[in-house]
């Protein structure tokens, strides 16, 4: 069962990637920068599309909602996803969760970590942590009142608005990311951050292998009876 679930997740992600690539290739050259593709859609949407070349796919609605500084922050965030190959980490986390639902918190932790990684990169590029925080918050709020995102963006996108609660301990990823950007920056090293994400992904791979072996053992036990 675990193996079947993993296959389904892989096929779904592959279809989303193929759809997104076709869409981006058709619109290539209609962007605001060399690696940016603008989709004529009023949805609030932006995501990094990995590959050779990698693209930043952004909706016209998103661009209209941000000023020039906000767009700079957005593009810096998405370029961090492309440069860091963050899709590899998130894919491993999601496959691990598909094989074993108990690992869903692990997948969410990986998603949040790569978003924070990209946030900090955008803050360094712009030199303005408050700008990045405001851009994230604005995009999340507007996304709640615009049309739903296409399938590819829903799977690959990074804009995941959550309802803000009173306590940040129970808040969704967006409020926590904004709070982290508004707080004084902690001394961090990119190598250590990359190592933390890699270790988390490695844990996911290990869990995936464990799930596979458990499935094999259950099949053997069933055959024995």
Located regions from the model:
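Transmembrane alpha-helices and immediately adjacent membrane-cytoplasm interface residues
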Residues: 1-25
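Hydrophobic core of alpha-helical transmembrane segments in multi-pass integral membrane proteins
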Residues: 1-7, 197-207
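Active-site-proximal gating segments in proteases and membrane effectors
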Residues: 26-51, 127-203
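Active-site scaffold of zinc-dependent metalloenzymes
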Residues: 41-67
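Active-site recognition of the HExxH zinc-binding catalytic motif
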Residues: 71-86, 118-119
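Post-HEXXH active-site segment of zinc metalloproteases
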Residues: 85-107, 111, 115
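An active-site-proximal "capping" alpha-helix that borders the catalytic cofactor pocket
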Residues: 112-128
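Juxtamembrane boundary at the C-terminal end of a transmembrane helix
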Residues: 207-225
């Amino acid at each position: 069962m675990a193996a079947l679930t993993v296959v389904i997740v892989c096929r779904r992600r592959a279809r989303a990637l193929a759809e997104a690539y076709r869409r981006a290739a058709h619109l290539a050259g209609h962007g605001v920068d060399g690696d940016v593709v603008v989709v004529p859609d009023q949805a609030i949407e932006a995501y990094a599309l990995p590959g050779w070349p990698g693209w930043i796919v952004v909706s016209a609605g998103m661009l209209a909602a941000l000023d020039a500084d906000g767009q700079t922050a957005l593009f810096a965030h998405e370029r961090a996803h492309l440069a860091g190959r963050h899709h590899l980490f998130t894919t491993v986390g999601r496959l691990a969760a598909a094989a074993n639902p108990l690992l869903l918190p692990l997948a969410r932790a990986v998603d949040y970590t790569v978003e924070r990684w990209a946030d900090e990169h955008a803050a360094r590029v712009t030199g303005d942590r408050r700008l990045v925080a405001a851009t994230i918050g604005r995009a999340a709020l507007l996304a709640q009142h615009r049309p739903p995102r296409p399938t590819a963006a829903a799977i690959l996108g990074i804009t995941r608005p959550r309802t803000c609660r009173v306590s940040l301990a129970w808040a969704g990823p967006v409020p926590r990311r904004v709070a982290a950007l508004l707080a004084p920056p902690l001394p961090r090293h990119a190598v250590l951050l990359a190592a933390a994400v890699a270790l988390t992904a490695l844990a996911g791979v290990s869990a995936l292998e464990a799930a596979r072996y458990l499935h094999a053992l259950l099949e053997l036990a069933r055959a024995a009876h």
